[in-house]
């Protein structure tokens, strides 16, 4: 099999630890959400996303209700585009004030840089908003890695468990789906990418999944525990 013409990667559980997102980013956004909405709710971009939240719950409600709804969605890990956009805005403040830096596994940082040096285009597809993705890579533990990525995709391109989303990405980057390798820790996402024709690899990191996924669950996906084990 020839080397892929492009690599598409997830972030949480793939390039970076699940615990960083769950234990650092989500709680930070939850704590900061009330003050952020009260202070910036009049900004057109912020109001755009707040209006989407109001549309979702089907009511003309005050901001305090929207704040409570957003915090509940954080607790539920809802993959709602408006929530992800607002979280990204809040995290931008945290990155810029150095309240935290984004975790990235050493093997992922090294391999992403190696693939970039070899001329393999790299793309990111995450449920986090595109601005949040860019901040994540720009403020990583390994330094600014944002320049390695050719383009970014979030749930505005479609849900991550639907094959149509991956077909859309292939069309946008101009690479045939069979020539794209998709990396993720979520089997359902890999299944969707494979149905779209992409090559797939499951990141089954012991740090995130102490009990390895079974062969039945992994199916036809390549299974690795780090980026260094990937066979292109």
Swiss-Prot record:
Keywords: Amino-acid biosynthesis, Hydrolase, Magnesium, Metal-binding, Methionine biosynthesis
GO process annotations (BP): L-methionine salvage from methylthioadenosine
Disulfide bonds: none
SUPFAM superfamilies reported for this sequence: HAD-like (SSF56784)
Metabolic or biological pathway, per its Swiss-Prot or TrEMBL entry: Amino-acid biosynthesis; L-methionine biosynthesis via salvage pathway; L-methionine from S-methyl-5-thio-alpha-D-ribose 1-phosphate: step 3/6; Amino-acid biosynthesis; L-methionine biosynthesis via salvage pathway; L-methionine from S-methyl-5-thio-alpha-D-ribose 1-phosphate: step 4/6
Catalytic activity of the protein: 5-methylsulfanyl-2,3-dioxopentyl phosphate + H2O = 1,2-dihydroxy-5-(methylsulfanyl)pent-1-en-3-one + phosphate
Stored InterPro entries: Enolase-ppase_E1 (IPR023943), HAD-like_sf (IPR036412), HAD-SF_hydro_IA (IPR006439), HAD_sf (IPR023214)
Cofactors named for this entry: Mg(2+)
GO-annotated molecular function: 2,3-diketo-5-methylthiopentyl-1-phosphate enolase activity; 2-hydroxy-3-keto-5-methylthiopentenyl-1-phosphate phosphatase activity; acireductone synthase activity; magnesium ion binding
Top-level taxon of the source organism: Bacteria
Enzyme class per UniProt: hydrolase
Cofactor: record remark: Binds 1 Mg(2+) ion per subunit.
EC number: 3.1.3.77
HAMAP family in UniProt: Salvage_MtnC
Function: Bifunctional enzyme that catalyzes the enolization of 2,3-diketo-5-methylthiopentyl-1-phosphate (DK-MTP-1-P) into the intermediate 2-hydroxy-3-keto-5-methylthiopentenyl-1-phosphate (HK-MTPenyl-1-P), which is then dephosphorylated to form the acireductone 1,2-dihydroxy-3-keto-5-methylthiopentene (DHK-MTPene).
Subunit structure: Monomer.
Protein name, per record: Enolase-phosphatase E1
Organism: Xanthomonas campestris pv. campestris (strain ATCC 33913 / DSM 3586 / NCPPB 528 / LMG 568 / P 25)
